[in-house]
Amino acid sequence: MTKLTARQQQVFDLIRRAIERSGFPPTRAEIAAELGFSSPNAAEEHLRALARKGVIELAAGASRGIRLLGIDDAPHQFTLPHAGLMQLSLPLVGRVAAGSPILAQEHISQHYACDPALFTSKPDYLLKVRGLSMRDAGILDGDLLAVQKRTEAKDGQIIVARLGDDVTVKRLMRRPGGLELIAENPDYENIFVKAGSADFALEGIAVGLIRSGEL
């Protein structure tokens, strides 16, 4: 691996940990806050230095458009697309009716053509975020969350789950006797789900985020 300065190594390690923990990289603002930079612009300078050294790649215009390169065991990595390959066509899921599959045709409002470089792993669909319960994870009302269908998730990953008639986005943590779905906003309460609860179903994990104007 290319030799990095101590500060560059800190930034690189932070990106790697974020991908391992949640499935997608941090924003510039999150890097600045975590490492004590004066502004997101300082984080951007370090990211560009890492890109010049060939250890990450930046996707222009995407707040989380960061990929780790050249690391055999890099978490949640995928093969980089060759120039000219078709973009991903992802269904955008709107409101989900109770009891029906999340990708049922009536839930799909439209399809988006997306650059695969925006995501840490190939998503199956986009889910429009409603509310601010995940604000402190950088996920805001109206954002499009890229979701990969899964029936299992690791502790700390951001998931999409059914709770009764609702679909929610939360951070997953296993607890004695069940699961805790953690909100990333102190104004919202965490949700405890008892083991074996029939009201809970894991729909997938977050693998990227698109903010309005990035498509």
Curated annotation (Swiss-Prot):
EC assignment: 3.4.21.88
Highest taxon in the source lineage: Bacteria
Active site: S133 (for autocatalytic cleavage activity), K170 (for autocatalytic cleavage activity)
Gene Ontology biological process terms from the UniProt entry: DNA repair; DNA replication; negative regulation of DNA-templated transcription; proteolysis; SOS response
Catalytic activity: Hydrolysis of Ala-|-Gly bond in repressor LexA
DNA bind region: 28-48
Site residues (Cleavage), renumbered to this chain: A98, G99
Keywords carried by this UniProt record: Autocatalytic cleavage, DNA damage, DNA repair, DNA replication, DNA-binding, Hydrolase, Repressor, SOS response, Transcription, Transcription regulation
GO MF annotations, alphabetized: DNA binding; serine-type endopeptidase activity
Family per similarity comment: Belongs to the peptidase S24 family.
Complex formation: Homodimer.
Described purpose of this protein according to its UniProt entry: Represses a number of genes involved in the response to DNA damage (SOS response), including recA and lexA. In the presence of single-stranded DNA, RecA interacts with LexA causing an autocatalytic cleavage which disrupts the DNA-binding part of LexA, leading to derepression of the SOS regulon and eventually DNA repair.
Protein name: LexA repressor
Gene that produces this protein: lexA
